[in-house]
Design a protein with these regions (language model features):
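Conserved, well-structured functional cores that handle cations and Mg-NTP chemistry
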Residues: 1-20, 28
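Short amphipathic alpha-helical "interface-anchor" segments enriched in bulky aromatics
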Residues: 131, 141-174
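Short, surface-exposed basic-aromatic patches at helix termini and helix-loop junctions that form
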Residues: 22-30, 49-52
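Short acidic/polar capping segments at secondary-structure boundaries
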Residues: 15-17, 31, 37-41
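An anionic, glycine-rich sequence signature occurring as long contiguous blocks
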Residues: 37-152
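Glycine-centered flexibility motif
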Residues: 7, 30, 70-78, 165
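Short glycine-/acidic-enriched loop or helix-start segments at secondary-structure transitions
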Residues: 20-22, 44
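Mobile genetic element proteins and their domesticated derivatives, centered on retroelements
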Residues: 10-13, 32, 126, 158
Length: 176
């Protein structure tokens, strides 16, 4: 079907991180923002390694966004890091359309439960066709902030789904 996604950034969870969806989003004028998790095999491992090396070498220090979180009985913050998609192995760049011009995104959440004081750390990774740089130069801070907002928006939808499943057993419904 036809959708006008011109300029939109479309997010999907790891289950839907498939080339066919990325192609369909791009065909309709949008950009994909797709979760990369362990169920996607080596893509996840390779992205994780790229960020690990870049952070260790302080290559992405200036390409970071940090946001405070306060609510739902938790306090903490998110850090979002962005690397150019072209850093991925060519086997992925041949497979994923527009990723060579796009971004790799890492988000780290540090959350502390206010009642218990227990702190958790979660890491999430994404691939996106959204351009890393408008002119081939360094990334703009506004792009990093936009990627951080995409992560926040993505997890807002994910947490809403979690509540629906918890209360209404939504994942148990079988549609035919």
């Amino acid at each position: 079907s036809q959708f006008n996604l011109n300029g939109a950034i479309v997010s999907a969870d790891a289950l839907n991180t498939v080339v066919e969806l990325a192609e369909a989003i791009l065909k309709q004028g949008g950009h994909y923002f797709l979760a990369a998790k362990g169920n996607k095999g080596f893509l996840f491992d390779d992205i994780e390694e790229l960020f690990s090396n870049a952070l260790r070498n302080m290559e992405i220090q200036s390409r970071m966004s940090s946001r405070d979180i306060n609510g739902h009985g938790r306090k903490g913050y998110h850090q979002t890091f962005v690397l150019p998609g072209k850093m991925l192995d060519k086997k992925y760049l041949r497979k994923w359309p527009s990723l060579a011009e796009g971004c790799l995104v890492k988000n780290i959440s540090f959350l502390t439960e206010t009642k218990t004081g227990e702190t958790t750390r979660e890491e999430r990774y994404f691939i996106t066709s959204y351009p890393y740089s408008a002119n081939g130069g360094p990334i703009e801070q506004s792009t990093v902030e936009l990627m951080a907002q995409c992560v926040t928006s993505h997890w807002y939808v994910e947490s809403t789904h979690w509540h629906l499943d918890l209360n209404f057993k939504q994942d148990a419904f079988q549609c035919q």
